Amino acid sequence: MLSQTTKGATHTMPILRGKNVLLRPYRRSDLPGILSWTNDTEATRYLTEIFDQPYTEKNGEDFLNYALSGGSERMMFVMADPVTEEYWGQISLEHISRRDGTAEVGVVLAKEEHRGKGIGREALSLLLRYAFDSLGLRRVELTVFAENSRARLCYLKAGFIEEGVARQKTWKNGKFHDVVSMAVLRDEWAKREEQA
């Protein structure tokens, strides 16, 4: 799984290899991949205001600079083709707290052709293994729009448990949306891994 590391601006990023997906650090050459989906209303329908439209090349450059700058509180990976390393989307651990042993995960599988094939679930599995086994975290959490049933199912299959609903929490596309909080604990994840 962990095959090598790449030095970032302020930290070393691992490269995580799966059968059907590769998690690698961002590169400057990923900008066209980012820009290829960020103005697609279907791809961004359930994402935070970071990807509100119109999404300009400058927005993409700013996001890429943020991803490349790294830091001890975040690790941002590109989900890529395991052979060509072509950009498919992104997955991250953000707000990493070594003291609390927690982090938040964010996932975007950018193109429809890659969805529904288990790629997101495999990427989550790679990231969770790294978070729990290598970083020593004890809890990984996320939030997801309640109506995003495809993502919620993916997260449930990856071992996340729904912990609660914040009603009418986020404004997006002209209305307020309920947001579901989900999390997985290291012990729960380890038990699932043993049974797999």
Regions found by a protein language model. Give the residues of each.
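Conserved GNAT acetyl-CoA-binding A-motif
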Residues: 133-143
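Conserved acetyl-CoA-binding loop-helix of GNAT-fold acetyltransferases
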Residues: 116-130, 152-157
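Conserved catalytic-core motifs of GNAT/GCN5-like acyltransferases
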Residues: 141-144, 161-181
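Active-site acidic-Proline motif in GNAT/NAT acetyltransferases
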Residues: 111-113, 117, 133, 146-147
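Acetyl-CoA-dependent GNAT
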Residues: 54-113, 185-188
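A short, well-structured alpha-helix characteristic of acyl/acetyltransferase catalytic modules
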Residues: 2-61, 188-196
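Short glycine/proline-centered loop/turn elements that form peptide/ligand docking sites
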Residues: 120, 124, 147-151, 168-173
